Amino acid sequence: MGKKEEAFEVEGTVTQALANTRFRVQLETGNEVMAHVAGRMRKHFIRIVPGDKVRVELSPYDLTKGRIVYRER
């Protein structure tokens, strides 16, 4: 396997649930991104609803899309 790209994580709040396990997330920085659920979260049936605090992994190449990697308790 190759080295993973240098993605960075930010905290945010889910504002809207969309189709195909996509969500609109308001980041702490004030930006809003589209994010999908990571495969391991889908595998373990972790549910995400609007209002949840989540950790989003963003690629440095496209800061408008992300991947939800953790849901705060």
UniProtKB/Swiss-Prot annotation:
GO molecular function: ribosome binding; rRNA binding; translation initiation factor activity
Every S1-like domain range: 1-73
Highest taxon above the source species: Bacteria
Keyword RNA-binding in annotation: yes
Presence of the UniProt keyword Nucleus in the record: no
Membrane-traversing stretches: none
Entry GO CC: cytosol
UniProtKB keywords: Cytoplasm, Initiation factor, Protein biosynthesis, RNA-binding, rRNA-binding
Entry-linked SMART domains: S1
Protein name: Translation initiation factor IF-1
